[in-house]
Amino acid sequence: MSRRSRRKKHIDHAKKPTAEQLAARTKKAVIIGSAVVLAIVAAVVILYLVSAGKKDDALASFDKKAELLREQVLSDKRSDEISGDIEEGLPDNVVFLSVCSGEERAKVFTGTGVDRKAAWLSAYNQAKSFIENENYNAIWLKADLMSEAKTYDTVEFSTELHHYRPEFFRYGIAFDKSFETAILEAELNGAKILDYENECVDESYLNTYLKKAGRSPLSSLPGSYVVFKCVGWMCDENDEVYDLISDIDDYGRRKVDTVDKEYAAELVKNASGFLIDQVKDDGSFVYGYYPRFDKNIDNYNIVRHASTLWSLVCQYRMTGNEELVPVIDRAIDYMVENAIVERNDEISYLYEEKSDEIKLGGCGVAVVALTEYMDAFGSDKYKDLAIKLGNGILTMLDQDSGEYYHVLDGEFIKKEQFRTVYYDGEATFALCRLYSLTSDEKWLDAAKSAVEHFISADYVQYKDHWVAYSMNEITKYVDDERYYTFALRNAQENLDTIYNRDTTYHTYFELLMSTFEIYDRMIERGIHVDYLDNGFDLEYFLRTIYKRADHMLCGYFYPEYAMYMANPNSILDTFMVRHDGYRVRIDDVQHNVGGYYLYYMNYDKLVDYGMLEYRDKA
């Protein structure tokens, strides 16, 4: 009998339920159904109440922050920064209010009015309507008050834009005189609306931005633009309000009274924490981001992997946080397992498979990272490997001339004599670290040979931070007056360039701080060289250190910068390179951490030598 027939037979012979049983079943079903309906209704009510509560909370938070900003916008506290240099025929009162959840690019609302209060109210009402309608949780609010405005035709604008490096035009643009379509500087640069190469506004990027922001795109670009500047204020997630700098060199980021020891420690902690978060399960890093459009950098460089390890160990030294240890170990293991090649039992190199290259600098920074790790953790775990890598460096050094060979291929065949001056300093720094690790004179002798070449070839001209690091390390063991003079010259003769540099140029700070440690060592040891009296300007040197410590904050992703990127939370509280599309890359962060770490370690001495007094005299 088929399965179907058996089932039919079973059904045919099944006992039919009574009327009472049917009624009971029906009653039970009704009760269950009613309970389900009630549960659904209750869930809907709860969700509604929760949603309404969240909406009320979001509105209350917005109103609190907005009121704090309103007080600033309507006050006269910064009247000296508001020149009133606004071209006739343009609105005198324009306020921009930016709101951001931290999860997406900020929304910006523009208000104009007969007075400042009316302009504020216009921007505020637009923003509040958005918060209500979208149930939007704005953790950051930023207010900008227009202080200057001038009309340029497109030819004049192109001429003006020609003078700026990418992302360094620090003015907003209105595309009509009534400011119906007005874009802040941070929006222009954050959404790539300015085409610096062709010195114009990119209509495609502009309209894409306007559409995504829910604003009307332009049918065509006008024949003239209103270029404007603002005075700004930032209210953060803790309802703290910061004045934003209006000077062009440091435009748009919060004013910091003094970049002191505690402030530097916080920068190092935050940025190193960012690096920790970039370590993947296999020990490699997320290499970097172009945050304007939240895009990963599709590349990897094992040399930068190695140098970044150094920053992770710095954070451990500062915090003693044991949770960092497995992350650091994982990142070192990745380097050791994937990028170390042996030439023989005595010689190893750091090898980059992608390019099939052995780079001198890579071997150098690998040694620095491993020795830093062993020193921080009181371990000799990587001693043998560090020595083998050091022997690899020696195969690339002509100790008679002090010159290095920079690049070998994967078969250990010479490929390129010179790649970058950085490699020389990195390798020499590593040799000095190996001497510290082993007390074997062969490392120090090799480092001396390289330093003699630095001096004879006048490496001062390269403004190289790795040379400064290597000089700082070797003068711990060698009291040669020529070494000290060269090290001081490496900073002094480049101070004008460093002091006046418009970009953050993070490696300059490392150069300065390494040189400061050398200077301090001279004073502590009572070492005097003629250059101290005839060339070295301590006041200018210390003033430059503070100037760079402060100016480099323009490369830090405070909320007021991050909020105009596509995914603010992903790059918050780390360092970036503005003139390369706000690039965030592990080595950029590492160099910033390196400079601020040394600043933190030496801050008390810097103050004792008069840094803050010299700063105030500038």
Which stretches of residues belong to each language-model region?
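Gram-positive cell-envelope targeting signals
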Residues: 1-57
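Solvent-exposed loop and edge beta-strand segments that line ligand/cofactor-binding
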Residues: 256, 291-306, 347-363, 379, ...
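Active-site/pore-lining binding-face segments in mid-to-C-terminal subdomains
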Residues: 124-185, 480-553
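CBM-like carbohydrate-recognition segments
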Residues: 300, 479-482, 500-618
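Extended, non-transmembrane interaction/recognition domains
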Residues: 105, 109-266
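Well-ordered alpha-helical scaffold segments within catalytic/enzyme domains
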Residues: 247-261, 306-322, 365-379, 426-439, ...
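Long, well-ordered core segments of solenoidal/helical folds
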Residues: 73, 217, 267-284, 326-346, ...
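Glycine- and small hydrophobic-enriched segments that form the cores of compact globular domains
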Residues: 272, 279-283, 291-342, 351-357, ...
